[in-house]
Structures are given as C-alpha cells and as structure tokens.
Amino acid sequence: MKMEVIFKTDLRSSSQVVFHAGSLYNWFSVEIINSGRIVTTAIKTLLSTVKYDIVKSARIYAGQGYTEHQAQEEWNMILHVLFEEETESSASSESIHEKNDNETNECTSSFETLFEQEPPSEVPKDSKLYMLAQKTVQHIEQYGKAPDFNKVIRAHNFIQTIHGTPLKEEEKEVVRIMVIKLLKKK
C-alpha cells in the first residue's frame, strides 16, 4: 500500500515504514508489527531488493542528472542513516515528540542567523556536511536568493530529510558556514 513518506529519526517508533529511495517514482514500503530488531530486519530485507542504480536512474528520469558516483554516495548515506542507530534502544513515542519539538526550536534559532555572520576562512573537510550545504543552497535558490525566516526553516527541514537525523550544534554551524561560502560564489 502506497503512503506518504514517513522518515523518522527513529524508524522503529513507526508502525509502518515507507522507504523512499531518493526518487519521485520508486516507492518501497514494508509493514512493521513490533519494534526493535524486527524493524531493522524488515528494512534490511526490503533494501536487499533495491539497488543504488534505482536511485541513479530515478534521479536522471527526474531531470537531475546524477552521476553514478553521486548516486552511490547517496545510496550509502541512506543505508548509513537507516542502520546507524541499530544498537540503541527505542524511546517512547511521547519522549520522541518532546525531543523533536526542542530540536525544532534549536534549529530555528541556529538558522535565523544564517546570513548575519561572516564565515571563518577555513571550511572543514567533511564531505557529508558539504553535500548537505550544497543541497541546502539548491533548496534556497529554488525559493529565491534572499531567504526569509520560512525559507531558512524549509532549508533546514530539507537538511534533516537528507541527513536522517537532526544535526548537532557544531554540525549546524559547519553547514551554515559552507552555505554562506557557496552562496557568495554564485
């Protein structure tokens, strides 16, 4: 059964996971009955039938023209995000909602100052965060070059979707600096 995307930080808290393999056209879903390792096993089983070239062909079909290398990187990131918390215990849904509210407020205050400060001269060599910064710039440009409050929040939500987990404070700062530098090059 097709549904809208459900892509939570803790996938095991959902009764059904819908996996969106980086594409507008290819959907894979699996029903989850219990929490914990059963969900991880179900997702692994689901992913074993999906190849990264589906991501590549879907991106090309969507007119985005990803190279095979970019598709492989994105695919690896999807796998990493899905399984990086495998050994951690699940939190109750109530504490997850509470945590998400706090993270949203932190994100808001962090990204409100996106264009107010000058970045330092050095950019850390973190390819994952750099990719997030590039995608953020693309997202901001889609809505116009002078982002208002809502556009900045949309950009951060876009980052969270790709990253799969909320950014740490130091990661937000690194991405903010990269975004500023990338926008200045335009």
UniProtKB/Swiss-Prot annotation:
- What are the subcellular locations of this protein? Host cytoplasm; Host nucleus; Virion
Q: Which GO terms describe its cellular component?
A: host cell cytoplasm; host cell nucleus; virion component
Q: What does this protein do?
A: Modifies the subcellular distribution of heterogeneous nuclear ribonucleoprotein K (HNRNPK) and may contribute to modulate HNRNPK functions related to processing and export of mRNAs during ASFV infection. Necessary for virus internalization.
How this chain assembles, per its entry, is: Oligomer. Interacts with host HNRNPK.
Which organism is this protein's natural source? African swine fever virus (isolate Warthog/Namibia/Wart80/1980) (ASFV)
Write out the entry's keywords from A to Z.
Answer: Early protein, Host cytoplasm, Host nucleus, Host-virus interaction, Phosphoprotein, Virion
Tell me what induces its expression.
Expressed in the early phase of the viral replicative cycle.
| Protein name, UniProt field | Phosphoprotein p30
Q: Give the similarity note.
A: Belongs to the asfivirus phosphoprotein p30 family.
